[in-house]
Amino acid sequence: MIVRDEERNLHPCLDEIAHLFDDIVIVDTGSLDDTTRVIREICKTEALSFPIEEKNWFNKYEARNFGFARLNADWILSLDADERIDPAQILNVRSVLGDGEADGFFTRWTTYQDGREIADYKLSVFRKDFRSSGLVHENVQQDMRLRGGRAVWTDLIHLRHFPDPGKTAFKRDFYKQRLRRAIQVEPSWYRYHWFLGYALFREGNPEAAEHWLQATASARSRQFPVECLNAHLVLAAIHASHGRQEIVARTLNSALSLLSEVGDDFEVRINFGLRPWIEHASQACSRGHLEEIAAYEFCA
């Protein structure tokens, strides 16, 4: 777990589950509140210090890897302080590890925000060998792909995510600023383009979003196949809202073509809604019912 000023979240996150783990590693990146004291109280251990200045927030993946390397266990359950997992499901974590073929497990990940429930997934359980990467929205998927690993789906684990409801306009702007800077540093890491485009789309700025979504979709990246497919979905919805039937059809045909190319990717396989959405949207487009084409919600 990576923390910074999380004293309010730690008790609801860890009180009922801390004693169920073989080892707990929590990395503090520079808390100014009582976070480290609360960790000591709950976990009977000290947080590891890995200070990150606000201006250098791209180092978060390094903080995760710092923690991974110090864990005395073969498998990692990666949690954030604003996530919750029921104690009984910790036992489920142990049970899924019996699948000797898998290197990781995607789990249900539901975000509760502004009175809405957003269903998504997270690669939350994985072998200790893998490393986190990415300047924003870091994860281990890229390392697992590059090393020929394989992650599968499990229904036995459900993480519930309760993000800070006070996400101000300043924080939203800073988030987009970080994504723009990340694109400059790693221009072929199309995960950043996708998240920037989707952030602009959610804010009601589809014209600005279209540029970044098109860059993602056109990349057809095998390193970021889900992001490229997601970009197709949102682009199709944008074009449908403007009545651009021909462009919608081309976008959906491109999505189906890409899906056939990357369908064997372990993350594409667990995106169970992708193909049904594309096929439904294609049928709606062919009938001229563009009003039926709306992107489903992603967590960002």
What are the roles of these predicted feature ranges?
Residues I76:
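Short aromatic/hydrophobic "clamp" motif used to bind/position activated sugar donors
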Residues H11, D33-I42, A88:
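Acidic helix N-cap motif at the loop->helix transition within catalytic regions
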Residues I2-L20:
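Short, well-formed alpha-helical segments that are part of the catalytic scaffolds
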Residues E16, L20, D28-I39, W57, ...:
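A conserved acidic beta->alpha catalytic loop
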Residues T36-E62, F66, R70:
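Conserved donor nucleotide-binding strand/loop of the catalytic core
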Residues A182-V185, S218-C228, S260-N271:
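Flexible helix-coil transition and linker loops at the boundaries of alpha-helical arrays
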Residues K60-F68, L79, I85-E207, R220:
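Catalytic-site signature of metal-activated, phosphate-bearing donor transferases
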